[in-house]
């Protein structure tokens, strides 16, 4: 466990190490959470970082299908990508959230991204796995920014359409906001 901790805290952030989002001691295991959790990435972890029969990987195996949809505007709150398309190697994408609701609106930083697969289904893309619980206040008429991160060194970006999701409560109703962008 100490060896794993030293590697995780080191400055040498290889793609295999950047794929690790957390680890801890279970009752009889070392539990590891990966940003992109596939059999191949688990083997990469064992080869490059740490191999032990005590390792147990958490969560479902990727890719995880997520065909949900959302809205770009709801009761005066709107969400859109700063640009309609970005280069394939992009690691950061900005989204503008605008308030024309007639009252103050508070938004946070948590989000998720899906990409369209060759079969037409949408699958979850590895992004930031933890977010600071913060509230950004927008007065009526103001706009703010949510910055999303992609990790092409963990899962190479493919050309195509992507969906950015941000969920918030408005008037007691959970609203799934969605904005699309393209990588090419």
Task: Label the predicted regions.
Residues 1-4, 56-69:
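Short proline/glycine- and acidic-rich turn/helix-capping motifs at secondary-structure junctions
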Residues 157-168:
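A short tyrosine-centered beta-strand micro-motif
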């Amino acid at each position: 466990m100490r060896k794993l901790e030293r590697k995780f805290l080191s400055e040498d952030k290889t793609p295999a190490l950047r794929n690790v989002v957390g680890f801890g001691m279970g009752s009889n295991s070392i539990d590891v959470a990966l940003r992109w959790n596939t059999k191949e990435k688990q083997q990469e972890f064992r080869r490059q970082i740490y191999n032990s029969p005590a390792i147990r990987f958490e969560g479902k195996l990727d890719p995880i299908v997520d065909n949900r949809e959302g809205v770009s505007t709801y009761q005066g709150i709107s969400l859109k990508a700063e640009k309609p398309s970005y280069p394939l190697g992009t690691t950061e994408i900005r989204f503008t959230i605008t308030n024309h609701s007639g009252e103050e609106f508070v938004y946070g930083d948590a989000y998720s991204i899906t990409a369209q697969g060759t079969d037409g289904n949408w699958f979850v893309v590895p992004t930031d796995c933890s977010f600071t619980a913060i509230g950004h206040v927008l007065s009526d008429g103001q706009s703010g920014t949510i910055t999303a991160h992609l990790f092409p060194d963990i899962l190479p970006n493919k050309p195509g359409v992507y969906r950015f999701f941000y969920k918030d409560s408005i008037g007691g109703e959970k609203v799934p906001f969605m904005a699309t962008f393209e990588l090419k």
